[in-house]
């Protein structure tokens, strides 16, 4: 008779706080991927990207744009989360972010970071500006595939 290998499956039990956090992140993913959010964010960036320059100096207008962005985008996300999770508390969620930093997908964390980190916000605008002005790197451009096999095999 064949020996059957036994597999141990362990059930991961998370705390109610962790489950709540995971629930919020799931909803955040849905909100951020939604066309309405994408239009809101890109519309805002289209309106202001020309103001940003890739220099060490930060213009005073950046602060105004940053505050307007927070007022618009963070408010939108918070309203969407409150519709989905009536007891949602943005400040409690924001404070728990650092504990769960490694668990959050990059795109979501980057967007959340733009609410609190001015440099992340500025970098987002500079990347957007480079894309709009066609200054992004196209890694597929100029690649050539060459066969390592000789096209003609000589017979002896």
From Swiss-Prot:
It is found in: Cytoplasm; Mitochondrion intermembrane space; Cytoplasm, Cytoskeleton, Microtubule organizing center, Centrosome; Nucleus. The keyword Phosphoprotein does not apply. InterPro entries: ARL2BP (IPR038849), BART_dom (IPR023379), BART_sf (IPR042541). The keyword Nucleus applies. One of its GO terms (cellular component) is cilium. Signal peptide: none annotated. Keywords: Cell projection, Cilium, Cytoplasm, Cytoskeleton, Mitochondrion, Nucleus. GO terms for biological process: maintenance of protein location in nucleus. Belongs to the ARL2BP family. Plays a role as an effector of the ADP-ribosylation factor-like protein 2, ARL2. PANTHER family: ADP-RIBOSYLATION FACTOR-LIKE PROTEIN 2-BINDING PROTEIN. This is ADP-ribosylation factor-like protein 2-binding protein. It comes from Xenopus laevis.
């Amino acid at each position: 008779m064949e020996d059957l290998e036994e597999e141990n499956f362990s059930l991961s039990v998370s705390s109610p706080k962790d489950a709540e956090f995971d629930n919020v992140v799931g909803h955040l993913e849905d909100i951020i991927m939604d066309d309405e959010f994408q239009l809101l964010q890109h519309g805002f960036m289209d309106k202001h990207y020309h103001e940003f320059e890739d220099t060490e100096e930060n213009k005073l207008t950046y602060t105004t744009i940053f505050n307007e962005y927070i007022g618009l985008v963070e408010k939108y996300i918070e309203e969407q989360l409150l519709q989905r999770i009536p007891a949602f508390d943005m400040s409690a969620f924001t404070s728990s972010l650092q504990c769960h930093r490694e668990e959050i997908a990059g795109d979501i964390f980057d967007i959340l970071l733009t609410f609190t980190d001015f440099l992340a916000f500025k970098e987002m605008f500079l990347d957007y500006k480079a894309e709009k002005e066609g200054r992004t790197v196209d890694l597929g451009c100029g690649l050539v595939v060459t066969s390592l096999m000789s096209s003609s095999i000589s017979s002896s």
